[in-house]
Structure formats: structure tokens, C-alpha cells
Amino acid sequence: MIDKKPEVLAPAGDRERLEAALRFGADAVYLGGKLFNMRAGTRSFTQEELAEAVKLTHQMGKRLYLTCNTLLNNEEADLLPRYLAEVHEMGVDAAIVSDIGVLMAAHRAVPELELHISTQAGVTNWLTATELHRLGAKRVVLARELPLTEIEELCRRIPRELEVEVFVHGAMCMSVSGRCLLSQYLTGRDANRGACTQPCRWKYALMEEKRPGQYYPVEEDGHYSYILNAKDLCLIEYLDKLAKAGVHSFKIEGRAKSAYYTAVTAGAYRAATDLMWRDPEHYRCPDWLREEVTKVSHRDYTTGFLFGPPEAGQCYETGGYIRRWEVAGVVTGYDAENRRLLCVQRNKFAVGQPLELVLPLQGVRTFTPEKLYDAEDRPVNCVPHAAAPFMMDYPEPLPQGTLLRMAVE
């Protein structure tokens, strides 16, 4: 019996990605500020930008969670209570923390602020979850390493007031719940403070120290090995099982990914969750949704640990992404008099290029443009310049933010 429709929680690395997540159906977003952020490589939000993000999110009836889940040093620990008080005053709906001391201090300093336990904390059992709830946690984000049977038991044995969130889509880490020292050891950039260089994705070869330059055969592609390179998680076919287990929130990984990735994954999981909720006992993920999540940059997909230890959870062929589709442009408006879509270019494309139109909350259409126009209303054969405005004949308006997508040859 599912008591409540699970939340679709999407990443928001910047304002553009925030708008994409909200527009394409996320119930909530998570993002980082300039402090305590596990994605130091992303742009992050200043305090002013954060206040605007909260305002926009609440105007759309959605929720916003702020990440505060790095490993803090002493100076940062002194700053945290005041920072949390400031963001609570802004209207942030919850803070995501990973350190038990931070949890306790935050609960004392701002008792009204909802606190979520990050996957970095490695919550794997009901006892830990229950004790974290006793210390002030409203929600726990479970470790990615848990099978469905363990999730079911954990949900059954924790207090009913404690919510459970799980990752359903995105990159996975070779270390337990992302706690890794490889990046710091090899490059000096600490993954536990948001600066991971992802050495698990690098190319490796075996060499004996007294024979420099002589490589030994452990390679998969004739040159190197990718033995640390995990596949990407995709659980869109199993949302019913997670909901029945007691999961309250379906989380999508990817704050450093593109706005296109954010839009497509949020839209796909929105549609799948709605479909599952209408009839949980007979949920079957449609083919078009399974295909939709393959049209973003991704590695080979896996169900991770959901059904036990993964058999082949690594990508041995390459450390890179699979990219079969890219964004040609984004719809910004409509010229009703001339019946033209107003758009902004994202990648070069031309007249006659078959497109897919990805509409917020309205599925996907196909279209092949026969006429394109530049910003001066002059007919053009192609749109070659990044971020250039252009127009395209189309019989009706499309929602702002609709994506024009094309296959990569």
C-alpha cells in the first residue's frame, strides 16, 4: 500500500538548470550555495541568487533543498549555524547534511529548518536511520549500495514520520556512497569537499616500477583498462517496487550535467511516476520513456545494487559518455502573426534536419523545419552560431523552454 505519491527530485546546478527542472515536472530541486557544497566545479548560487531561486521555486508550488554536505573544517563549522539561519530566513525548505555533529548543531541552531541526511552519510540500516531521526533528521537519503530487500526492511522498521529518499538515476561512484580519496591522493583535489576529478573514469594500464614504459596486458580496448569506471544508474522501470517499499522521494543525480539532461530526466521520471501512481499494481514503464532516458549523455545503464550485487557494473570499453542526441535550440516564444517559433540556438543545424520537439509535461513530437529565419527576418539555410536567436515556421505556439533535439550522426 503506497500512502503518498513519491516526490520527483531533480538537480539544479545553476539558474538555467533550475528552470528546466521546474518546467519539466520536478516536485522539488536540490542545489548548492557557495559554502558547504559537494559540487565545487559547478557555478553554485550566491546568496542573492539563492533567494531568487527560492522565490521562483515557491511561485511554482515546488520545494527547494540546499546541500550542506561537505566534510567541514573547524572554520566552516563556526560559520554553519549563521549560514543555516540565513537560508532558513530565505525560505529554503530543507538543508542536506552528512555529518552527525552538523546535524545536531543545525537542529539546535535552527530547530524549524527541515534536515535531510545526505547519501554521503552512508545510511544502510534502520537503526542508523532511526537514531538520526531522533537527533533531528526529517529524511534520510539512503546509500546507493542497498538492495531492494534491505530498503523494504529499513522502511518497515523506521518511525513513520521519517522520510526515505533514494537515487533512481545518474552517475554512480566506485566508493561506498561517494566517500573516496582517489582524487585527493592523485591530484590534491578532495572529492569529499566537492572537487572530485573523477580518476575512476581515467584510462589505466599496469606497469612494473623497474620496467618503466612497459605495459602489461590487463586492457579492454588494446591500450588501457577502465576497471574503476562504474555504469550509470537507471531505475525508471522499477519505481513501483521502490514506492511499495516505502520510498518517499525519487532522486536524480546530476547537478553538474546540462540543462538538457535535467529537463529530459525530470520529464521522464515525472511521466513515469504519474503513470505508476495511477495504477501501482500494473505499472510497466512505456518503451518511449525507456528510450527517452537514453537520449541524454550517459554511460551504459545498470540497476546498481537494487537486485543484489551488480554482475557487470563497470564500463570496460570507455571512460566517456554515450551521446546520440544533442540540443539544436530552445523555444523562447511565438510570433502569432507570422506563425513562427522564436528560438535560441544551442548547436548548429539546418533546414531539413529532422527534429524532436521535447515539450514540458507534454511528451515529444517530431518535426522537420522547411524554413529558418535569422533575427533580422532573413531566410537562412542553417543556424551556425552559438546562442544566436532564430525563427522557425510552426503552426502553433509551443511552451517556453521546449527543446529542439536532433540525432548526432
Task: For the regions a language model picked out, list residue spans one by one.
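Short beta-strand elements of ligand-binding domains
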Residues: L66-T67, V97, I117-T119
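Surface-exposed amphipathic alpha-helical tracts and adjacent flexible/coil segments at the periphery
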Residues: M1-R23, A28-L31, L35, V54, ...
